[in-house]
Amino acid sequence: MVSNNILNTVSQGVFYLDPLTHGVIGLAISTFSGTPVGMTNPITLGCSIGAMAPDIDVVTKFIWDDSVYLKHHRGFSHTMPALLGLSGVITGILHLLFPESAIMGIFLWTMIGALSHTLFDILNSYGARLIPFVKKKFKMNLLMLYDPVVTLLALVLIFKSQKDIVVYGTSVAIFIVYLFARYMMRKRARKAIEENFAHGYKIISIDVLPALMAFHKWNFVLSTNSHNIAGQVNILNKRIETRKKLRREDKDLVKVFKGSNAGQYFTNLSPNYHVTMKSDEGRIILEGIDLRYFMRDNFMHHATVVIDENLNIVESFLQPYKYEKRIPVAEHF
């Protein structure tokens, strides 16, 4: 049941389990304050709400559309100034509700919760901005979007009635060991990919990222001198599944795609993209494909730029989450 719900929400572009997981992590972190978990505890509320607050950028999806949401998601709202501001607002509201509470204590734990959100986003494959005025999203490609081990560890901290320094120390140690284990799993996956494609291809780069749902599988995007290859590797048996092997198109056509407004948006969104070309009634259709996320026999995000025989842009549109979805993009003709 969980896997079907996750597949549905991911394909629709709203990963509801993501903020829920952040909230659970925030609750777990609040236990380190030594205070009981409860709805009447401002530290509990502050830490858990703070852990979900950076995803306030989801409002862009409902005010505008998916393309604006994708552009801003895990952006400025995840940077240090935004985390401080959000923590301040949450602290102010909680202090009004609990005037007898220590305001600095609430702010500290709310800020820790908010910071945990950005740090856990950095640990997975989407990444997040941490520094304002730096558009690059930092990512470590270690954790799945919904990570069962992290969630289980958080739930133990929340529901275990008796907690002491041994429990807290053990929890932190398990988390650190788990991160190292995920790092070694990714390293094993990369080695398997290199061994499989070393013969017959000149490898330029390999990006390895956690599968959306499978704990023992890792997705990869392999760039070679002739092809871009997207697939998945099972680290238990080192079995490689090649999902798509796409031949690189003419560099001039790729340049036209990247020079369009739709292409600029798309290449900023995805560090791992491929451009395909096909002709249709005197027009050339350039299609950008985000090679990172593959669901239901297709990639999640696309962008299309249509040009004439003189390489002038006729139209362009973005296709986030669903190939059939088309969001027109204004171009300078």
Where do the model's predicted regions map?
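C-terminal regulatory/interaction regions
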Residues: 196-333
